[in-house]
Amino acid sequence: MLMATNSMEISINASAEDVWAILADFPAIAMWVPMIQHSCSITQATSGVGATRRVQIAQQTLVETVTVWEPQQRLAYTIEGMPPIVGIATTTWTLQPSPKGTRVTISTEIPSSRNPAKRFAATKALERMSLAARFMTTGLRQEAATRGREVTQ
């Protein structure tokens, strides 16, 4: 299957443990991503593989289910609720310790095909997901800085 992919990388002045603590609070993404109006767990499990959250962004409701849970290293989840022609996307966060904190990579994959309509839809969806990734990485960096100040005070 062809996949449309996008990734971005940022550095955060916080340990992988501290960054993971933010990502691992899976249902609470609305607390640090301003474009998300609401998020909540829709499974009993709020962490680990299988944990599922509902995310409300404007008029769109997404359901995100954890598929990879490697503490302080990698978190991946599927995203359902986009237009049917787009299908199910996958977002992966990767954390790598660095001399100045943590290097964070967020990548998104969306199914594509040789069909021009599906390829166009995947490209447009990936553009929106790229914008969302910028909001999420900015929010993650700000949340890590806020929590770091709380710890040092």
Question: What label would you give each PLM region?
Answer:
Residues Q56-T105, E109-S112:
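Hydrophobic-ligand binding "helix-grip"
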Residues E109-Q153:
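A conserved amphipathic terminal alpha-helix motif
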